[in-house]
Amino acid sequence: MPPRRDLKKILIIGSGPITIGQAAEFDYSGTQAVKALRGAGYRVVLVNSNPATIMTDPELAERTYIEPLDLEHLEGILAREAPDALLPTLGGQTGLNLAMALHEEGILQKYGVELIGAKAEAIRKGEDREAFQEAMQRIGLEVPRGQLVGSVEEGLHFAREVGFPVVVRPSFTLGGTGGGIAHDEAELVEVLSRGLTLSPVHTALVEESVLGWKEFELEVMRDHADTVVIITSIENVDPMGVHTGDSITVAPAQTLSDVEYQRMRDAAKAIIREIGVETGGSNIQFAVDPKTGRQVVIEMNPRVSRSSALASKATGFPIAKIAALLAVGYRLDELPNDITRKTPASFEPTIDYVVVKIPRFAFEKFRPLRNTLGELKDELTTQMKSVGEVMAIGRTFKEALMKALRGLERDVRALAGVRTEELEKKLYPNPDRVYAVMELLRRGMPVEELYQATRIDPWFLHQMKEVVEAEEWLKTHPPKDREDWRFYKGLGLTDRRIGELVGKGEKEVRAERKALGVVPVYKTVDTCAAEFEAYTPYHYSTYELEDEVWPSQKPKVVILGSGPIRIGQGVEFDYATVHAVWALKEAGYETIMVNSNPETVSTDYDTADRLYFEPLTLEDVLNIVEHEKPIGVIATLGGQTPLKLAKGLEEAGVRLLGTPFSAIHQAEDREAFHALCQRLGIPQPEGRVAQSPEEALRLAPEVGFPLLVRPSYVLGGRAMQVVRDEGELKRYLEEVYAPLEERPSILLDRFLEGAVELDVDALSDGQEVMVAGIMEHVERAGVHSGDSATLLPPVHVPEEALKKVRDYTRRLALALGVRGLLNVQYAVVGEEVYVLEANPRASRTVPFVSKAIGVPLAKLAALIAVGKTLKELGVRDLDPVPPYYAAKEVVIPWIKFPGVIPELGPEMRSTGESMGIDQDPYLAYYKAELGAGQRLPLSGRVRFIGEGLEDLKALYQEAGFALTEGEDYDLLISLVPDPELRRAVERGLPFITTREGAWWSLKAILRARESGLRVQSLQDWHQKAPRG
């Protein structure tokens, strides 16, 4: 069937700001789909409120709208653009829910827009829990017994029938939001009340528990001709009860018998046909009772999902790209496999390696010790809590597991010092469980006992035990020949770990291994187990004899990615590395990407010329550098992870491109930076560096309270706090500093109360400096810059202060010897400007500033790194200021951490961001708030909590708002961490926790009342901006 030519213009909805349960995988799938559809001759309109994405780059779609993802703005875009079709399956749950709302409200019909990829009925059947159960019964497949309920009473009635525990799954929510496991009636009342509130349709499925069963997923694709292919099977190492996004997973499935697998395949094909997903991908989840083999269907996602991103990276089969092309009428057998160029997409991938994914968590950012449910603070349940993930490829499960563990950037012996009885308490589902299991295996706990405690399949436990036994043997039998070395390295053991076991240093072990000629070989991900030649260079390392990767003779550059997403190091850094790859490719260099994150555009097989899917450790990166012999490595774009490798790479003789390591060190070394600022005559707040807690207590009175305290060398404000007296400082040192593994020095800074903070992104070639963007923080000093709303250009900073900011930024860039990007943070009091810190690397604001001014900063930085100047790159305006305002607001996943009361402080907690653009700064702010899910009411009741709020109350009353003390309000403003804030989170109501936020929000509300809704594409905004 030829592609549909009756469709000319297609609208794609993105997934909005990154949050837990919906991360960079949708940027990856959306980017792939836009490229595929434009390549097939379609015009593409994209809408997404998230500026930190590749998909919102103005070059990608024909028209790009960075607007809030709600019905009003979508209708405005439909009216303006008149697309023929809407593809809803690439924007995660957000995109799917929005498409359904547009359909149900009759808006799609009004504008004559067709839903493609998945019809409304298929989406309803796949997402509506009751409809899905009925569909499964029709085709004779078992599901756990369950009932769709609309009230707590109905839920209690059903639970009494089937017995506890029961699982609660709210309808149409993301990453299991609002769901959970209830072990008794009191817990059910709590979980179900929350779930019913958070479900957009206020229903939830209460079902019998299959806790402890094995969990499997199949990625399935279907075309118009009813060809169905299974892309891969995925097995969850953690049993049922842990959300699949929070579970360690492995592909292909390892413990299914062939008969069980065939049964599952047949079921998956029947399901995709019954639900009616005519084109595209679906993810179907099954549970298997390990005792009886009983197989039940858990759920399906009739869209591209987190698992499909993982399946794409695991197999090399581009699910999102193929799904987009199937949606416009192609058949699977008409689409070639990019990797082999010989086989069509209707050939199921075959893989001759094992892939392991491990999630990355951020519990340390959200700290109540117990929530009201009695869940332990880091317990994993059916509600997803991880913020990122790492993937590794090996020839065996053991090798892939050990590579993935080191990709998390944590010591595999993280729990070595913990007492056995404490370790036994860590066997409930939590992020440390895999470390506890391995440590207990080292101490001789039998596999059967561990199985009873964890329900992790004995096969996986035996695999871990084999690694542990090999480590034990190694202590007394150091490797003596190549075979020994290959055996130990083939288990995924690092040089450092081998060194610890045999009593040698990492460098010595590396030298011994290389002297024997034992180096990794690189294998290729080819979708066909080496049956056909592969044309796309996508590689992983292993310790075997045959190398499948031959380096070319072209000049090449290695770009280091940022590893798993975490709070403080998000998709913004992936954005910067992808732009660098594209720029260097255009400039004629062969680009080599090294990264371990399966969710991102950087690890797409067609982003760089070569992709090494490897952990970002010094050993792994040096192996690649020695294999490829590049002209140099770029380590300043991927955040703190590659930056930490810069010193080791330089010591090993690797050339760092761009800003030299000496500049990075000078900016991060407190005393060196202080001396530099004094020499340049740039004011800094009073500050000291202490090497121990005792010294910190002695120095604090010299600097004077209040103090901003933090450990040196951290990202995302980890362990940063404002302390107001000696008692608070002592508590900080005992509770926050003492548990840190590395015990760095302690920075004590005078805290400037009431100062306006500015964030500046600049670009330097060593001669000239472009001050690309100056951003004003809405929240005052003391709130981490990554958690503050920002405006570009600034609204409330005097011109005299801005002149100083530009001048100081130029002086710092040139004095540090920056060749590339520089981020500087300032505090402004009146016209006085103080520098807080400078980071000679890509910052998390680079995508936002690039979109705001219409200049691709990361691309320019990469070209400067290989010797170009700003003049040569055609940059004429060194102080670009757009003739409109761009606002950025952050998203913090409070809802995922029951019991946590929202509060902003110096430690970063946001996972994502939204952007608003308008001629008026307050309307830009209003749009950014809407984009972040904060629906500020234009009228209604406001409740205030806290002292000294009379001025704000008067302003809100003057604006026509009624004040209330009760629970029935439309907006909550609480300047103290009151439990009512938690209730607002759970009821989905807007809330504000800072005085500045309340003031800005009121101004924004007043402007939004006056002016109607305006939507405009990024391309149109950029027409107005002065070209750099």
Swiss-Prot record:
Keywords: Amino-acid biosynthesis, Arginine biosynthesis, ATP-binding, Ligase, Magnesium, Manganese, Metal-binding, Nucleotide-binding, Pyrimidine biosynthesis, Repeat
Ranges of residues in domain ATP-grasp: 133-328, 674-866
Similarity field: Belongs to the CarB family.
Region Carboxyphosphate synthetic domain, residue ranges: 1-409
UniProt remark on cofactor binding: Binds 4 Mg(2+) or Mn(2+) ions per subunit.
Quaternary structure and interacting proteins, as annotated: Composed of two chains; the small (or glutamine) chain promotes the hydrolysis of glutamine to ammonia, which is used by the large (or ammonia) chain to synthesize carbamoyl phosphate. Tetramer of heterodimers (alpha,beta)4.
Chain sites annotated for binding Mg(2+) 4: E837, N839
Keyword Signal listed: no
Name assigned to this protein: Carbamoyl phosphate synthase large chain
Pfam families on file: CPSase_L_D2, CPSase_L_D3
Record: residues binding Mn(2+) 2: E299, N301
Binding sites annotated in the UniProt record for Mg(2+) 1: Q285, E299
Any single GO BP term: glutamine metabolic process
Binding site for Mn(2+) 3: Q825, E837
Binding site for Mn(2+) 1: Q285, E299
Residues reported in the UniProt entry to bind Mg(2+) 3: Q825, E837
Pathway stated in the Swiss-Prot or TrEMBL entry: Amino-acid biosynthesis; L-arginine biosynthesis; carbamoyl phosphate from bicarbonate: step 1/1; Pyrimidine metabolism; UMP biosynthesis via de novo pathway; (S)-dihydroorotate from bicarbonate: step 1/3
GO cellular component terms attached to this protein's record: cytoplasm
Domain-related comment: The large subunit is composed of 2 ATP-grasp domains that are involved in binding the 2 ATP molecules needed for carbamoyl phosphate synthesis. The N-terminal ATP-grasp domain (referred to as the carboxyphosphate synthetic component) catalyzes the ATP-dependent phosphorylation of hydrogencarbonate to carboxyphosphate and the subsequent nucleophilic attack by ammonia to form a carbamate intermediate.
Entry's Gene Ontology molecular function annotations: ATP binding; carbamoyl-phosphate synthase (ammonia) activity; carbamoyl-phosphate synthase (glutamine-hydrolyzing) activity; metal ion binding
Keyword DNA damage included in the entry's annotation: no
Superkingdom of origin organism: Bacteria
